[in-house]
A protein has these predicted regions:
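Active-site loop/oxyanion-hole signature of alpha/beta-hydrolase fold enzymes
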Residues: 31, 75-122, 272
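Post-His helix in hydrolase/transferase enzymes
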Residues: 278-293
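Conserved loop-alpha-helix segment in the C-terminal half of the alpha/beta-hydrolase fold
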Residues: 240-278
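Conserved alpha/beta-hydrolase catalytic His-Asp/Glu region
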Residues: 153-154, 158-160, 174-236
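Flexible "cap/lid" loop of the alpha/beta hydrolase fold
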Residues: 128, 139-177
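Bacterial N-terminal signal peptides
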Residues: 8-19
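N-terminal cap/lid segment of alpha/beta-hydrolase-fold proteins
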Residues: 23-35
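Conserved HGGG/HGGXW glycine-rich cap/lid loop of the alpha/beta-hydrolase fold
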Residues: 34, 40-89
């Protein structure tokens, strides 16, 4: 009896250990000039790929990494876009059409098929640029993580856009010029805007991530992003892919209005601030799980 119990306990421990996948950190040469740093976890067959936003890195998705570590259904990937985090600081290519090509190369080199694709913030432009150039045949579902489909509108408080055309709040100029002229000020303001609870420790940690992106690259990717408009590309996915728009609380009404007009089948959830998936990871991950339950 004691031997049987011991064998049962050993079996349970081994089963648990085998079902848990630690985060693996790897590098991948995706073309002649770019080597991408990426992380992966989980033991499933369905790939999920999340793309970080402007100046950010894989570190922002650490709580999603933990969430999927024991998954037997999904394998979760995230990577540092060109010029960000630990990926190559290339001389050129710092615009979103090229980011879309980089994403294509990343998926191709790893052989990832029928991907659940998510983009946070300006990372939404990465995934939409990929879909514009290569189509959506390799995409199982699309998740916009507080990512707007275009940059400019009449009013960035009432429309699902990043900037007002007149830049009345000065945000476009700040993220371009303050990045060059006063990086510490920009970091503090940017990180503070992203957080519900901007403690000194959180601001310092996230500012360190921001600063992995050189100022000239950060300024260029902010300004090139200001010209992007992927509304037609996102709208064209209606009825073709499951869509999830997870946005910060103050973008809930604009995102729902846009979805009602263009993608009525989309699931829209709103809560917290720009880093809601990091600060309120349990709430975000629960919503993500519910959405994934509808994806086949």
């Amino acid at each position: 009896m004691a031997t049987h119990k011991l064998l049962t306990l050993v079996t349970l421990v081994l089963t648990s250990a085998l079902s848990w996948s630690p985060v693996r950190a790897e590098t991948l040469k995706v073309d002649d000039e770019l080597t991408v740093y990426y992380q992966v976890t989980g033991n499933g067959q369905i790939p999920i790929v999340f793309v970080p936003g402007w100046t950010m890195s894989t570190k922002v998705f650490d709580k999603q990494m933990a969430h999927f570590a024991q998954s037997t259904k999904y394998r979760f990937y995230t990577f540092d876009p060109r010029g960000q985090g630990m990926s190559t600081k290339t001389e050129g290519g710092h615009f979103y059409e090229q980011h879309g090509r980089d994403l294509h190369n990343f998926l191709s080199r790893l052989g990832l098929k029928h991907v659940v694709l998510g983009g946070w913030s300006y990372g939404g432009f990465d995934v939409l640029a990929y879909i514009r150039e290569y189509g959506a045949d390799n995409v199982r579902a699309l998740i916009m993580i507080d990512a707007a489909p275009k940059s400019l509108g009449a009013n960035n408080r009432t429309e699902w856009v990043w900037f007002s055309r007149d830049d009345a709040d000065g945000s476009r100029r700040a993220y371009t010029m303050d990045t060059l002229l006063n990086r510490k000020k920009m970091d503090k303001n940017f990180v503070g805007w992203m957080l519900e609870n901007p403690t000194l420790a959180k601001v310092a940690y996230l500012s360190t991530i921001c600063d992995q992106t050189p100022g000239t690259i950060a300024a260029l990717t902010n300004e090139t992003g200001a010209y992007e408009d992927y509304e037609p590309d996102l709208a064209a996915l209606e009825g073709k892919l499951p869509l999830l728009f997870s946005v910060r609380q103050d973008m809930g009404a604009p995102a729902r209005k846009w979805a009602a007009e263009h993608t009525p089948s989309a699931t829209v959830i709103s809560f917290g601030k720009h880093l809601n998936f990091w600060e309120r990871s349990d709430q975000f991950n629960a919503g993500l799980d519910r959405f994934l339950g509808t994806v086949h």
